[in-house]
Amino acid sequence: MAPPAKRARRGLVPPGYKYLGPGNSLDQGEPTNPSDAAAKEHDEAYAAYLRSGKNPYLYFSPADQRFIDQTKDATDWGGKIGHYFFRAKKAIAPVLTDTPDHPSTSRPTKPTKRSKPPPHIFINLAKKKKAGAGQVKRDNQAPMSDGAVQPDGGQPAVRNERATGSGNGSGGGGGGGSGGVGISTGTFNNQTEFKFLENGWVEITANSSRLVHLNMPESENYKRVVVNNMDKTAVKGNMALDDTHVQIVTPWSLVDANAWGVWFNPGDWQLIVNTMSELHLVSFEQEIFNVVLKTVSESATQPPTKVYNNDLTASLMVALDSNNTMPFTPAAMRSETLGFYPWKPTIPTPWRYYFQWDRTLIPSHTGTSGTPTNIYHGTDPDDVQFYTIENSVPVHLLRTGDEFATGTFFFDCKPCRLTHTWQTNRALGLPPFLNSLPQSEGATNFGDIGVQQDKRRGVTQMGNTDYITEATIMRPAEVGYSAPYYSFEASTQGPFKIPIAAGRGGAQTDENQAADGDPRYAFGRQHGQKTTTTGETPERFTYIAHQDTGRYPAGDWIQNINFNLPVTNDNVLLPTDPIGGKTGINYTNIFNTYGPLTALNNVPPVYPNGQIWDKEFDTDLKPRLHVNAPFVCQNNCPGQLFVKVAPNLTNEYDPDASANMSRIVTYSDFWWKGKLVFKAKLRASHTWNPIQQMSINVDNQFNYLPNNIGAMKIVYEKSQLAPRKLY
């Protein structure tokens, strides 16, 4: 007889928990709640301390502080007890200052006592000193992986790694020649790591790094700009060409990594969608390092010669909106995120946001003789909200060689499926019983169930007939819904197209025919366009959703009449002529069946140009889905990261002389890197047949390769090819 299996040691763990309590083992499976997850992380840190020869039980350690921070808002009784226990320990126990060999990734980086630099630093210093350069000094701190917990958006940490030197360059005391070169302060990493866990789970760590180029802003001022293209909307039928709005143009730029192509290459995405069934968004962190600031001057000779010099006293301004104070402006909707090619330098997008502006546009139908009416009301004084970064968000000043880390933000989002559903209402439940079956092979027209339609059993909602058919049998819910398709609505600030969730409807699978709600992306060379000429039309693609939850606008009809009456023109909605002779109206413009019985899938991840996460609306009634991103952050989302080259003034600056400052032309190159962590569930096979997966053939393989001058494109990839049943 085989010996009994050894059970994991539970220790003094209260009911309902697996790790909250002393003496338990670290193999209890998934934690039961956030407090239990914090306890598991705490236990792992203690184990690391013990392995390194330190006793965390007699000292107050960083792991204890981390547990206090993670349970400060705990609602469960165990988390509350643990929180106050370690607060009491903090008050009486001596502090354990040394960190374990593998510290956690969720504690703020703080300046610590300077440690002895490695030997190669002294060798480099000796060489520089011999050449006449200054010495390098460095504040030794932990790398970005030791960033801060970011429950409310993150607490940034700045590390100064600045070189000092005499230099012979011009422009703000900048260093030129052989001086002013700092020590490399980070690593360039674009690998995607897959860690296979228990019970079919996979931890996916996407690393991304980019060289970012940032020019100084055209102006140091905030500007309120009114955009008015009334020449277009003055023509009847052109309401959809309306561009009128007001925006605040700022001197800052936005570093936005919120797009799938920033994090995954095409091969990574193929592996994910072919083997995983769902994605969970876990955490996000980012860092700026190896900051370089340079000035540009021109000689007086003809033709003029530009001279570039390192400026060790110029500053890069960095602000992290960790509390989401500023308007949320995801750049993926304008295809202005960081670029998708790790080996190509990229630029951040100039940051701007909408400002309140009332107007009325009364359109004219193309078949009428009237002209559109445009009335501009201006800004309502009750609605003015002018935001400035300088007085709303802490701003950090970085100089050559400095670093900035945001810390780690942990997401609270619902998971995203990587499978699609094929069942519509006609495929739900138990099919009708067939009294007889086909007797010959290949029969395709077996049309008789064998029981008269008024003699069948079952449930319908037809009160005036006894017929039970596949059309009348009662289904549990409605899969998908009829939406206002291609409809525009008026708002106080102008018309907008109604968003609808993407879904496959009818037979529309041609990418040139927009199916129900399928998004269409236009993008440039940073984000997948192959052409190398300037000023070209952006490349485009339409992402056809696989979910069978849409409608077929070109061929749908809706009948709303008594069952036993003939169909009349005023009681049926057809694709054309839906209401008593009025032509040119699609029924989906005026009919909406969304209700409490509607079943709908989330939007798919759109690789590479789609947005990953979105911010939850601050409204009492919140939308259940957002059509631009599969992950909607509950309560808070990662803080937006803003950068700006600080004003580098000349001695001629006079604040009263001109609206434009007298500045030295200065720009910055810096390295950005980030880490985005997912948890994914491996997809299990439950069917006999193999399924379609993301693949390529010999012909389209070359879409992923550069040509002889380096031009290449990123082809969009499907994310929900694998089918699943929904009922």
Swiss-Prot record:
Family annotation (SUPFAM superfamilies): ssDNA viruses
Residue ranges, annotated region (Phospholipase A2-like): 19-64
One annotated GO molecular function: metal ion binding
InterPro entries (alphabetical): Capsid/spike_ssDNA_virus, Parvovirus_coat, Phospholipase_A2-like, VP1/VP2
Comp. bias regions, Polar residues: 25-35
Chain intervals with Gly residues compositional bias: 166-183
Transmembrane feature ranges: none
Disordered: region residues: 1-38, 95-184, 507-536
Binding site for Mg(2+): N323
Role noted for this protein: Capsid protein self-assembles to form an icosahedral capsid with a T=1 symmetry, about 22 nm in diameter, and consisting of 60 copies of two size variants of the capsid proteins, VP1 and VP2, which differ by the presence of an N-terminal extension in the minor protein VP1. The capsid encapsulates the genomic ssDNA. Capsid proteins are responsible for the attachment to host cell receptor TFRC. This attachment induces virion internalization predominantly through clathrin-dependent endocytosis.
Misc. comment: The capsids of autonomous parvoviruses expose a proportion of VP2 N-terminus and part of that sequence can be cleaved of to form VP3.
Domain comment in the entry: The N-terminus of VP1 is sequestered within the mature capsid. It contains a phospholipase A2-like region and putative nuclear localization signals.
Record protein name field: Capsid protein VP1
